[in-house]
Curated annotation (Swiss-Prot):
Residues 1-27 are annotated as: Disordered. Belongs to the NusB family. InterPro entries: NusB-like_sf, NusB_fam, NusB_RsmB_TIM44. The gene is nusB. The keyword rRNA processing does not apply. It comes from Pseudomonas syringae pv. tomato (strain ATCC BAA-871 / DC3000). This is Transcription antitermination protein NusB. Involved in transcription antitermination. Required for transcription of ribosomal RNA (rRNA) genes. Binds specifically to the boxA antiterminator sequence of the ribosomal RNA (rrn) operons.
């Protein structure tokens, strides 16, 4: 059985910087784990449930938003065609030509832009860049930044325009 994250967010707690920081740190960890799991899926082709189970056994999830990890991992897989269709016009390469880790980061970020409207687009971009700095090639973060900067206005037009005012 998959354990559920017991650190549920309460909107009344949003005023507390410690709680907000704790939630964002757990989400960052979830994004890192999901990126690694998506990379593993791409490279090894194992089943999602098998990869998820392995990650939960092999890693300490005490500082990870486990629910968000699962949502990202399965959400990217379920919506991969829609994600790749959204990504393609913003790329100078084909999906197949992309570095596998940068592809995992871009798919994860695109999923958040498409399906997690509650996460501000600037947060999605910044998190994608940070993931690329940790896991990507030397200039991978610049590539990820460029793609997400093109993608965000296409997927979050109203939000991006409102921010630029």
């Amino acid at each position: 059985m998959i354990s559920d994250d017991t650190d549920q967010f309460n909107p009344r707690d949003a005023k507390s910087p410690e709680i907000a920081k704790g939630k964002s740190a757990k989400r960052r960890e979830a994004r890192q784990m999901a990126t690694q799991a998506l990379y593993q899926r791409h490279m090894a082709g194992h089943a999602l449930n098998e990869i998820e189970a392995q990650f939960r056994v092999d890693n300490d999830f005490s500082n990870v938003d486990g629910t968000y990890f699962r949502e990202l991992l399965h959400g990217v897989a379920i919506n991969q065609t829609e994600i790749d269709t959204a990504l393609t016009p913003c790329l100078d390469l084909t999906i197949e030509e992309l570095d596998p880790i940068e592809l995992a980061i871009l798919r994860l970020s695109t999923f958040e832009l498409l399906k997690r409207i509650d996460v501000p687009y600037r947060v999605v971009i910044n998190e994608g860049i940070e993931l690329a700095k940790v896991y990507g090639s030397t200039d991978g973060h610049k590539f990820v930044n460029g793609v997400l900067d093109k993608l965000a206005p296409r997927l979050r037009e109203v939000e991006v325009k409102a921010h630029k005012r």
